[in-house]
């Protein structure tokens, strides 16, 4: 059976029932049909004095084109904890339509461990991402309207981009304002994918609607004739934008196929943004459950670094344990084994590729000072000899390995890691950030590059050097740094998988996200608008005359 067929074969509980199981009354949710709901603001006030549960962060080794199943394992762990009678809640990101119709597919898990209704979640869900798109593009239209009606603020350069929640490389560089009308000034522009929009980051970092509005007002939109920054609040745009986001700021409640509550909210990418679900969703889940399972995008060098240095710093949180998801296929891929031979037993390939996993373990355990366990997401092609080799090697390093078979067995396939996590979260940690906010912008970038990526150093292109000095002069030198780079390698070169030679990270430019409260450093050739593959997933997605959807995975 396909994922969507498995999902449709399960009878879901009414969302009112799921809400009641975690102490939320029917009047405190806003239902979107029978199986989806928004959690109202009243709940935040009601649970504010509850004791926090334990926070478990799920990450992965460097991703491969084969997929590692991080969301699948996250769901399996939450279901597994319920199997051993622990009150667990999921706190995940919302899928973007770009990957759903592109190459990666959806983000609702797979097999017997999925969040549901999967086709709704993977498509429009409750409209959060569309609301973000509208707020983003409203700001663009307000900027151009201001320029049209006299340009009182003396815009010389507009840095704010429009967005759309699709992969569309044609929109990377465009020309706007070509109508020839008086006062419409043509200019070169571009689109970002919505999940890379600063408004997505703001939604995920805002504590409440008041904080949201303040952050929206602080968005840098352009520069005047004297190179002074111009902000959204100078255009009086923040109120209208916040109004568009009044429902989007409320976390969404759904369930797994085994009826574990799942709070799904926000969805920035981790390669081009900070890669975590919303602070509001995570904090709410911690008040409602004893164990909260959340994830950070891509590998531990990207999503986890940003989860810890950006999200946890802002929210005053820290994980009680970190799960690194690995697959034997991925380890062999990092060991140089071709995709066509990846399912064949190959101890030598594992021996060559396990270094990638070691580096992520070292970062979590020693660089961040956190408890760590490895979850091996098992496939049918994995052999006992391969599993034993990995287990023995991790034992030598004092790291526990748990075999997770959630895809095939549901929560029953994750009871081992669930029990191990119950023990692990009670161990003491010595959590530390990679850098302090008082350090120079370059120092922050270099600490991430050297300590987390393992680079020899950092090379700054001229535009990047200028931006660093400019942002410091503007008073933004104390912001955290969000490095945008490829997810496939510790380096900024996606083809450099082993990273066993000396390499440097090249920072070509920086972008100030004054509203979200961080600086983006662009490394390598990272794009903020992806393109579709030659044969996108969209080709296999269809709907019949009865409304049944096929092809989403």
Q: Where on the chain are the PLM-derived regions?
A:
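Flexible phosphate-sensing "switch/lid" loops adjacent to ATP/NTP-binding sites
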Residues: 1-553
